[in-house]
């Protein structure tokens, strides 16, 4: 039997299970693999295989995450599931597992709980754009009215965090019953609910825009001059594409962006007509002096990104065990903020009524940088002191 090769004919979407501890996220994840495996769309993953997620390090932060993949008739999915609440917080803030949408698991027997609320809030903050709900353990609820009550409660909760609660698909079922049955038939009382959930995920969570289709951006990693030809900026194209003769802007470290034209693109010492997201390139820039561009700036499609100094962010502060601070920090804390390729000093303003932030906390803060940097909502950064990472964050809004 020849090994099946991975055919990327279907659109790819990243999703994950979120919700309160013990509401059945991991059981549901296992059930999805079992049900989809009956039509050849997945390899069966047992509960304990998912639950014993390996440790990963993302920006110096230890996160336990299980990665499962499966496909429906229309799409290929990469699905993340985390064993502990802290792992979700870290995952969502560092963007270690970028989610195009999430399956919110709520126990029908208990209704929404504190972490249900916190995961919805985090999804709103870090830009998880779509949520589909699975009311799990509904085999334990005999009263139809109780199910309707939980359904209403979840919709109200989603509305309160600016998700369209009234239009959100909610499927009631039981991950455990589907897992125990495993027949995978659509007409089955329990396996059918898993199919219904996946049909809703297929229909409700849109296919994300691919990185190459977004406006061009390349963080500048290094700069050198070629005698007789001009200045070359090197880096990895983060998104979009760039062609020879395209106009671009140099953004960051100065008050205003500066326009220039890309007169050459090279990769592995070969000249190219264009480069796209993922390529490591050197871009030859017209009329730019070696001293007028530096690491920490970005090359971008004109008008697509601006330099800013003031923004709001959701941050996670590393614990002592993770190599972070041993002590809390206070209002006016001045660490370095590492964006893409460079460190910039900034001042932290804590929310009203918050005196201090302890290692292990996650919190919303305002930051004022001393130098403008090309930033936008959704951009991830590290917080450092003397080159050592003490926190991670994501930009949730630009203040000016």
Curated annotation (Swiss-Prot):
Location of the region described as G5 in the Swiss-Prot/TrEMBL record: 174-176
Source taxon at top rank: Bacteria
Domain called tr-type G: residue spans: 10-209
Keyword Magnesium: yes
Gene3D superfamilies membership: P-loop containing nucleotide triphosphate hydrolases, Translation factors
A Pfam family reported for this protein in Swiss-Prot or TrEMBL: GTP_EFTU
G3: region residues: 81-84
Keyword terms: Cytoplasm, Elongation factor, GTP-binding, Hydrolase, Magnesium, Metal-binding, Nucleotide-binding, Protein biosynthesis
GO CC terms of this entry: cytosol
Ranges where the record places region G1: 19-26
Keyword Signal in record: no
Enzyme Commission number, as recorded: 3.6.5.3
Entry binding sites for Mg(2+): 26
Alphabetized GO MF terms: GTP binding; GTPase activity; translation elongation factor activity
CDD domains assigned: EF_Tu, EFTU_II, EFTU_III
Family: Belongs to the TRAFAC class translation factor GTPase superfamily. Classic translation factor GTPase family. EF-Tu/EF-1A subfamily.
Its biological purpose: GTP hydrolase that promotes the GTP-dependent binding of aminoacyl-tRNA to the A-site of ribosomes during protein biosynthesis.
Assembly and interaction partners: Monomer.
The protein, known as: Elongation factor Tu
Source species of the chain: Desulforamulus reducens (strain ATCC BAA-1160 / DSM 100696 / MI-1)
